Amino acid sequence: MAKEFVSIQIRHDMEARTLELTQEDYWVKAVERFKEFLPRAGPKERLVPLSPADERLLVEPSEEEMAEASHLPYTSLLGVCQYPSAYTRLEMRYAMSILSRFRTKWGKKHFEILVKTLEYGYATRKMGLKYDGNQAGDKTNVLEGYADSSLSLPRSQGCRTVVMNNAAVSFTSKRHTTTDDSTAAAELTEQYLCACDVEGYRNLMQEIGLMQDGPTVIWQDNQAAIQIAMNRGALAKKTRAMEMRVMTIRNKIEDMKVVPMYLRTSEMIADIGTKALDPKLFIYLRDKLCGYGKE
């Protein structure tokens, strides 16, 4: 197997049954390229790519602020940070989603926050995605889905991921294309999208001879969305505005392809793609998402 491919370092230990994908060299080159915007002592140690405090500062800049920061290479640095977030640094996807909204109009504060994201990537450059084929019990090559959403107007921010062998094989963090009128609706939208992703991966696994025994679990931290999907409880009938999504999920449940189950928010790894988190929770969820968490 190649040791490097499109700037991704590949470490495959056949005896240990592990596969690790990192971009350490990429981050070193990125810091060298933008070193004039970093402290003289070098990049600072950052624990998160985007802090809750910095997220609150990301508002549309004034004309004066845009003119003052027009010389700063915001779009270039944004592209440099986006590339790893698409392949090996999935935990950075939410930060990139937010910062990308200012690609045509940014101020000095936006650029400074983007530089912090670069510093985070460099500080954690040895990390990536680590897959482990030695899963306890019957979890080897078993798919699991995680779906979460943060209700906001005009469109909610959703995140979903599919995990296999201790790390993510699919990860999406983006705003919904429709307006959600409740938390349950937002969560159900993400559950529906995750169920579609899961079905695609189940079909792929079947084609290569890795059959899934039973339905794939989709973990969620919203009981109302689960009850609606399972056609249980008082909310099950109040789904007119979500009819297509609800029927699709219920059909997949009946066909034994997926089953939604509850997981408390502190363990919900998809939460990392819905909002900026404090360092302790972020690191815990990041390690579980990327394969570095201890079971």
Residue ranges and their predicted role:
Residues 1-295:
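Long, low-complexity, charge-biased intrinsically disordered regions
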